[in-house]
């Protein structure tokens, strides 16, 4: 996993609340066995509407997704995070997230930022008015800056540490590889081994 320090660029003003994982990536896309290539399935059903915000040329290349409350609700579907990330989003800003989706984002290097509903509304309006506006999510300083918005956000210290250092679950485990090997060498031969 790559470290996440700052996500800066254009933002996609989605703004919908209660977007579930089935809306983020349809179930028929889950048959794939690779983690890449899911970006083309992001909001697939909604993208059939030519007026859907993701289809607008002015929002192409956005790296920050701005959503409504309870983003990522529904079934636990890590593919939803893969679709968000594979499309090019490094951060998602919303008033709230479904817990499982938020945890899956952390484990895959996507920064989730919870801001007050009114702040998200102002940011959405500003980006809709000026699609070229830059939004900056700085994990090191725990700040979000955009047109008319400059604020701090809270994030769990351990989550922040993981993201800043690019540590997924495997990366965290490998940080203790020597300790694990030392423990395995010290175990009597008649004890079970981890392979």
Swiss-Prot record:
One of its GO terms (cellular component) is 3-isopropylmalate dehydratase complex. It catalyses: (2R,3S)-3-isopropylmalate = (2S)-2-isopropylmalate. GO terms for biological process: L-leucine biosynthetic process. Pathway: Amino-acid biosynthesis; L-leucine biosynthesis; L-leucine from 3-methyl-2-oxobutanoate: step 2/4. Keywords: Amino-acid biosynthesis, Branched-chain amino acid biosynthesis, Leucine biosynthesis, Lyase. InterPro entries: 3-IsopropMal_deHydase_ssu, Aconitase/3IPM_dehydase_swvl, AconitaseA/IPMdHydase_ssu_swvl, IPMI_Swivel, LeuD. Its EC number is 4.2.1.33. Gene3D superfamilies: Aconitase, domain 4. GO terms for molecular function: 3-isopropylmalate dehydratase activity. It is an enzyme of class 4 (lyase). Belongs to the LeuD family. LeuD type 1 subfamily. Heterodimer of LeuC and LeuD. Catalyzes the isomerization between 2-isopropylmalate and 3-isopropylmalate, via the formation of 2-isopropylmaleate. This is 3-isopropylmalate dehydratase small subunit. It comes from Rubrobacter xylanophilus (strain DSM 9941 / JCM 11954 / NBRC 16129 / PRD-1). The gene is leuD.
């Amino acid at each position: 996993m790559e470290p996440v320090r700052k996500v800066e660029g254009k933002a996609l003003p989605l703004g919908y609340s209660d977007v579930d994982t089935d809306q983020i990536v349809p179930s028929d896309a889950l048959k794939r066995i690779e983690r890449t290539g899911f970006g083309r399935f992001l909001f697939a059903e909604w993208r059939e509407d030519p007026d859907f915000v993701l289809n607008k040329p002015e929002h192409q290349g956005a790296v920050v997704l701005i959503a409504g409350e309870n983003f990522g609700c529904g079934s636990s579907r890590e593919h939803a995070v893969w679709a968000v990330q594979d499309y090019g989003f490094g951060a998602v800003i919303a008033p709230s997230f479904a817990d499982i989706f938020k945890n899956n984002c952390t484990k895959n290097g996507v920064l989730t930022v919870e801001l007050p509903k009114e702040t998200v509304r102002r940011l959405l309006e500003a980006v809709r008015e000026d699609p070229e506006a830059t939004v900056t999510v700085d994990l090191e300083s725990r700040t979000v800056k955009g047109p008319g918005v400059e604020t701090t956000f809270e994030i769990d210290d351990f989550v922040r540490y993981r993201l800043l250092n690019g540590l997924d679950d495997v990366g965290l485990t490998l940080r203790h590889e020597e300790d694990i090997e030392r423990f395995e060498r010290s175990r009597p031969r008649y004890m079970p081994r981890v392979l």
